[in-house]
Amino acid sequence: MMTRKPTSVGEILQEEFLEPLSLKISDLAQILDVHRNTASNIVNNSSRITLEMAVKLAKVFDTTPEFWLNLQTRIDLWDLEHNKRFQQSLANVKPALHRHDTSTFAM
């Protein structure tokens, strides 16, 4: 389990891309062809990035969609690992491989 929350998509976007290029959120929105609120929500970590947004960000900043999606996935996993309700539910999940009758999984 990760102890420190991973750097967010918004932080990376702001510090590594927007600031060095002197871009504002409104500039990013125009470049991405999205509403300013959409760009603001991403930069301020109020919303997750979608597959479509990852592809757009990759094109704009000459990266890959996987770069952006991996950042988002790391945050999502960290959030789940630290979500008590989910962890309680997960404790009730049993591995299928420990079942006595494995014939239902045979091909």
UniProtKB/Swiss-Prot annotation:
UniProt keyword annotations, A-Z: DNA-binding, Transcription, Transcription regulation
Entry GO MF terms: DNA binding
A Pfam family per the record: HTH_3
Alphabetized InterPro entries for the sequence: Cro/C1-type_HTH, Lambda_DNA-bd_dom_sf, Toxin_antidote_HigA
DNA-binding region: 24-43
Source taxon at top rank: Bacteria
Domain HTH cro/C1-type: start-end pairs: 13-68
Family named by the database record: Belongs to the VapA/VapI family.
PANTHER family cross-referenced by the UniProt entry: ANTITOXIN HIGA-1
The name this protein goes by in its record: Uncharacterized HTH-type transcriptional regulator HI_1251
Species of provenance: Haemophilus influenzae (strain ATCC 51907 / DSM 11121 / KW20 / Rd)
